[in-house]
């Protein structure tokens, strides 16, 4: 499974629904799309939260990102990520 970083920004609508139950629903939604929530963090700065998730592929990650926005009112920027060891191997192979 591939790792994806999901940076979230609260909208006014999204701020109204902050609950532990919504967080549980979000994790279940990722699972419904073939993913697994590995970690979640609240942030200070231009982004308000970070979800680290694994998905089988880009299609599942994109669908989950869109579904999360519909569920929560939070906008997400979702990016694939590789470990530094994977990156070093890719760099060596070029």
Located regions from the model:
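Short S/T/G/P-rich N-terminal loop/turn motif that feeds into the first structured element of a domain
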Residues: 1-31, 36, 44-47, 82-94
């Amino acid at each position: 499974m591939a790792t994806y970083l999901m940076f979230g920004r609260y909208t006014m609508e999204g701020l109204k629904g902050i609950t532990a139950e919504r967080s549980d629903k979000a994790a279940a939604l990722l699972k419904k799309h073939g993913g697994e929530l590995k970690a979640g963090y609240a942030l200070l700065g231009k982004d308000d939260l970070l979800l680290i998730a694994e998905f089988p592929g880009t299609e599942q990650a994109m669908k989950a990102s869109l579904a999360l926005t519909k569920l929560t009112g939070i906008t997400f920027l979702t990016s694939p990520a590789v470990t530094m060891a994977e990156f070093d191997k890719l760099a060596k192979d070029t």
